[in-house]
Amino acid sequence: MMRSLYSGVSGLQNHQVRMDVIGNNISNVNTTGFKRGRVNFQDLISQMMQGPARPNERVGGVNPKQIGLGMTVATIDTIHTQGSLQTTGIKTDLAIQGNGFFVFRAGDQQMFSRAGAFGLDEEGMLVNPSNGMRVQGWQARSIDGESVINTSAQIEDLMIPVGSKDPAKETSQVYLACNLNKNTPLIPAGATAAQIQEGTWTTEYDIYDAFGGTHTLRVDFVRNPDQENQWIATATVDPNAEEALVQGLTVGDVESADGRTFIVEYGNDGTLRSVQNAEGGQDNADVLAVSLTFDVPRTSIPVDPVTGAPLGQQTQTFDLNLGEVGAFIDSMTQFASESSTKVFSQNGFPMGYLEDFRIDQSGTITGVFSNGNNRSLGQVALATFRNPGGLEKGGETTFVESINSGIADIGSVGVAGKGKIIAGALEMSNVDLAEQFTDMIVTQRGFQASSRTIQTSDQMLQEVLTLKR
């Protein structure tokens, strides 16, 4: 009877543990990134009343006689199933769809979590606003003017420096893709202003110097009266400026005498054939271009406050790309249809400020600058474990690496089984209330049954005590 008492006590104690876990699950039903717990029971040791006997020629075998001495908690598991995603529309809210944990830095310690309600602090760091833990990843580095993210490097704090500057870049390449009407009238000798205007097609586009100054590139095209399928082009920079910019124009390493004129020749199919100048320079490559040089206005160049000497280059050279020989797309053409103006690309830009940012499914943070540039600022890292169930809970919906979880495998999204990141959403708790209420009923009945075992054993002891009377 004493055995049944202690068995009943173990039932009470361990069903209370299960009830504690259920209560914690229910209380965290709306906790972002929470992972529910689950209690598994196992029986305790058993007392051997009689051992087993081997069968022989005369009798069969005898099974052992054992009395169980109660039960205990086998495991308290953390169930890392996917929680449902809730859209928030907040760009710093991140959810993981699939495997992985966000990596935080709390002092010298690494923490891991599925809760992605992030924000920016005063320094522009991406943090968990509730505790200041900094989100880890890889910050972009500028190499030759391009933003590069090295995901093989050590992870670091992620910064989104809203308001920071994107330095200006001078134009070095301009790409034309306009059509010149084959039926454009020739400009006769002694032409009037109206005839000159009717026989000229003009393309204008903004280009930039190294200081972010804006200049107007203008190219005037007129048909060559001496040669069919040829156009004479005149390139100028800031043609309406009070101080004309001295220019130089080179075709095939031969400079035009006037520094601005070149000849474009088309084939009978309306596509580019060659570019040349009157001095004999010619470009017959697959991609045709001329090189143009202009003086940067003195007002655009900063000067040394002591010596007054300019602190930057005073001339600038860029390539004016006309297109590919024989190509119809992204190249200049000559067809009997209306002339069109299209400079489809140039690689310069003025200085800009970081105005906004966005985070994509790869965790890459892209900055949107006022000058129209989009640059990578960094990438959020994810961590996976061989045994995520072995992680220790660290409070504040975080986990800590343990000796049984394995070492964190930190990498970029989508690599080695890592999930993807959903921006503007949060992962909700994976607690199912219907399941928890069912477990609560079962646990309550188990607790009641264990208490009834104690009551019945007590009544039996009372009966034994009354035998003496």
Listing of model-derived features with the role each one plays in the protein:
Residues M2, K35, V39-D439, G446:
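Small/polar low-complexity and glycine-rich loop motifs
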Residues G8, L12-H15, N30-F41, S429, ...:
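Alpha-helical heptad-repeat coiled-coil segments that mediate oligomerization/polymerization in large
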Residues V17-V21:
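N-terminal glycine-rich anion-binding loops that anchor highly charged ligand groups
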Residues S450:
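Acidic/polar, glycine-anchored loop/turn motif associated with catalytic or activation segments
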Residues Q462-T466:
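N-terminal membrane-targeting segments
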Residues M1-G8:
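Generic N-terminal amphipathic, Lys/Arg-enriched alpha-helix
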